[in-house]
Amino acid sequence: MANPIVGRVWKFGDDINTDAIIPGKYLRTRDMQIFGTHAMEGIDPEFTKKAKPGDIIVAGTNFGCGSSREQAPLALKHSGIACIVAKSFARIFFRNAINIGLPLMEADVECQEGDEIKVDLFKGEVLVPEKGIFKGNKLPDFLLDILNDGGLVAHRKKVKGEHK
């Protein structure tokens, strides 16, 4: 996992539902690229045409609420989103994102869509040029380890290999 994560901002509001992140009609596929090409389609059908790899989502409260589908963070990850910063996350979305290796941070950040920001997960800070540093909730070390290893499955394989 790269740290800090530097990327262009896409802004979203409160209560962004998993059904809006990846509509249910795409849930039967196992092709991750299909998930990626339909990310955020329920809110902005053109999102994946505009977003670029390395971009960052900044959102309000309760990001990822709704049904507990792992496909929602997978869709964002496979669309190229490098990180999500939100005032708060639905708990199941938060853990699903960690489990698949999608970095995120809870922070109240003042920025505009299109701004380039720097997210430092190890410090729990977001730097917005000309606006300053916004303190967020630093992830515990064990969650940073999971993200660093690329997600829970990769982390377990690494840990298991270290204990042989």
UniProtKB/Swiss-Prot annotation:
InterPro entries registered for this protein in UniProt: Aconitase/3IPM_dehydase_swvl, AconitaseA/IPMdHydase_ssu_swvl, IPMI_Swivel, LeuD, LeuD_type2/HacB/DmdB
CDD domains on file: IPMI_Swivel
Reaction(s) catalysed by this chain's protein: (2R)-homocitrate = (2R,3S)-homoisocitrate; (2R)-homocitrate = cis-homoaconitate + H2O; (2R,3S)-homoisocitrate = cis-homoaconitate + H2O; cis-(homo)2aconitate + H2O = (2R,3S)-iso(homo)2citrate
Pathway: Organic acid metabolism; 2-oxosuberate biosynthesis
Any matching Pfam family: Aconitase_C
SUPFAM superfamilies referenced in this protein's UniProt entry, alphabetically: LeuD/IlvD-like (SSF52016)
MF GO annotations: homoaconitate hydratase activity
UniProt record, GO biological process: coenzyme B biosynthetic process
Quaternary structure (record): Heterotetramer of 2 HacA and 2 HacB proteins. Cannot form a complex with LeuC.
This protein's name: Methanogen homoaconitase small subunit 2
Organism from which the protein derives: Methanosarcina acetivorans (strain ATCC 35395 / DSM 2834 / JCM 12185 / C2A)
